[in-house]
A protein has these predicted regions:
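N-terminal loops that bind phosphate or other acidic moieties
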Residues: 1-203
C-alpha cells in the first residue's frame, strides 16, 4: 500500500474507534439538551466509512476525503450529518482543486461552508465552537498535541454557553451547564486524528 493509503485507512480506524468508545457518552450529552441520538448517529456514520475503508484508501487523498464526507451525509443523519459531511466534502474539493494545496486554507474554506450551512457562528454552542479554534491552531501551525488540547478545552467551554442553534436552542437558558454533544464529538475526532498523525507521521 502507498503511504497515503495506509494513512487514510489508519485515520478511518482511529476515528471509528474513538467514536465507538464514546458513543454512549455522546448520546447522554444529547439527552440532556437534545434528543439523545448523537452517539448513535456518529457511530452509524463512522461504521459506514470503516466498512468501505478499502475503497477510500484506493483513492487519491483529496478524493477520499470528499467521498468520506458524502458517506457521512448519507449515514449520520440528524443535523450533524450534513455539517460533518460538508466539512469533509469541502476540504476534499478544495484540496483537489489544487489552488489550495495548503491544508489550512482548505480547512478555513470548509469551516466557513459549515457555518453557512448551519447558519451558525462562534459562541452559539455547536461543533463550530471546536472547529474555529482548531482552524486557528492549524493556521498558526501549532503542534499536533496543541491542536488536540485546544479542541478538548474548546468543547469544555461550550458548557457555559447558551445554545442558539439546533435542538438545544429550544431550551434557551436551560442549555447552559451542559456540554454540546457535537462539540464533544468534534473534539474527540480532532484528538484521534492528531494522535494518529503524531504517532505515524512527522508533524
Ligand atoms: P439532531 O440535533 O438532529 O438530533 P445530532 O444529535 O446528531 O442531530 O447533532 C447535534 C449537534 O449538531 C449539536 O450538538 C450541534 O453541535 C450540531 N448542530 C445542530 N444544529 C447546528 C447548526 N445549525 N449549526 C452548527 N451545528 C449544529
Ligand atoms: Mg440529536
Amino acid at each position: 500500500m502507498r503511504d497515503d493509503q495506509v494513512l487514510v485507512s489508519g485515520l478511518i480506524a482511529a476515528c471509528r474507534e474513538i467514536i465507538a468508545a464514546h458513543a454512549d457518552h455522546l448520546s447522554e450529552l444529547d439527552r440532556a439538551i437534545g434528543d439523545g441520538d448523537h452517539g448513535t448517529n456518529m457511530r452509524r456514520g463512522c461504521e459506514a466509512v470503516y466498512a468501505d475503508r478499502d475503497r477510500f484508501s484506493q483513492m487519491p487523498l483529496a478524493q477520499a476525503i470528499e467521498e468520506i464526507g458524502l458517506t457521512l451525509v448519507l449515514t449520520i443523519g440528524g443535523a450533524s450529518g450534513p455539517l460533518y459531511g460538508t466539512l469533509l466534502m469541502e476540504i476534499g474539493r478544495r484540496l483537489a482543486a489544487g489552488g489550495e494545496a495548503d491544508f489550512s486554507a482548505a480547512l478555513t474554506g470548509a469551516v466557513e461552508a459549515v457555518a453557512r450551512r448551519g447558519r451558525a457562528q462562534r459562541g452559539e454552542k455547536t461543533l463550530l465552537d471546536v472547529l474555529y479554534p482548531v482552524q486557528d491552531e492549524v493556521i498558526r501551525r501549532h503542534a499536533l498535541s496543541a491542536i488536540a488540547e485546544r479542541a478538548e478545552t474548546s468543547a469544555t467551554l461550550t458548557v457555559g454557553m447558551k445554545a442558539l442553534r439546533g435542538r438545544a436552542s429550544f431550551l434557551g437558558e436551560r442549555s447552559i451547564g451542559h456540554m454540546d454533544p457535537g462539540a464533544r464529538s468534534c473534539a474527540l475526532l480532532t484528538s484521534a486524528i492528531c494522535h494518529y498523525l503524531k504517532e505515524h507521521r512527522a508533524a
